[in-house]
């Protein structure tokens, strides 16, 4: 049984809630003092993990639609990608305002240059910005074949983002490793596509 247009619409509502409600929880948790002695780090890690979750969900759509023979699932991919960018932007903002502080914004450039894991994170964010800005059908028509070439850079983000996460934690825990392995699996699902690039 294939999804109907109406079912996809309801799925989009659910996914919007999945993207928005964690933000509500984040504010509530901060107000209730739920975080540890270093709430800035907690918020940074939470927002970063949310961005990674939506990135992986975005990458899951195409193989899932293909293997499950559910072509309409492709319609949720843009939504997931935009939530990935939204959470990545919150992640960057939380680092800038909570870690550096509003009075030290001038240090952001040097921090990105001098800390390799921040360099990777910024590369990911810039790519996501470009993908979000060109995600509309109008931009797809305007860019033509270049649109697909640009959006293939999401695979670079899928490689760099888990490395950024692994590099940023002081104590390696199972969580960043799991995200990295999931990214590898989702990229491996596209091995035929990657092979065609090298022919």
Swiss-Prot record:
Pfam families: Ferric_reduct
InterPro entries documented for this protein: Fe3_Rdtase_TM_dom, MsrQ-like
GO biological process, one term: protein repair
GO CC, any one term: plasma membrane
Entry's Gene Ontology molecular function annotations: electron transfer activity; FMN binding; heme binding; metal ion binding; oxidoreductase activity, acting on diphenols and related substances as donors
Entry's transmembrane regions: 8-28, 54-74, 82-102, 116-136, 149-169, 171-191
Keywords from the named record: Cell inner membrane, Cell membrane, Electron transport, Flavoprotein, FMN, Heme, Iron, Membrane, Metal-binding, Transmembrane, Transmembrane helix, Transport
Membrane association type: Multi-pass membrane protein
Keyword RNA-binding listed: no
Function text: Part of the MsrPQ system that repairs oxidized periplasmic proteins containing methionine sulfoxide residues (Met-O), using respiratory chain electrons. Thus protects these proteins from oxidative-stress damage caused by reactive species of oxygen and chlorine generated by the host defense mechanisms. MsrPQ is essential for the maintenance of envelope integrity under bleach stress, rescuing a wide series of structurally unrelated periplasmic proteins from methionine oxidation.
NCBIfam families noted in UniProt: PRK05419.1-4
Subunit structure: Heterodimer of a catalytic subunit (MsrP) and a heme-binding subunit (MsrQ).
HAMAP family in alphabetical order: MsrQ
Name the UniProt record assigns to this protein: Protein-methionine-sulfoxide reductase heme-binding subunit MsrQ
Gene source species: Klebsiella pneumoniae (strain 342)
Gene: msrQ
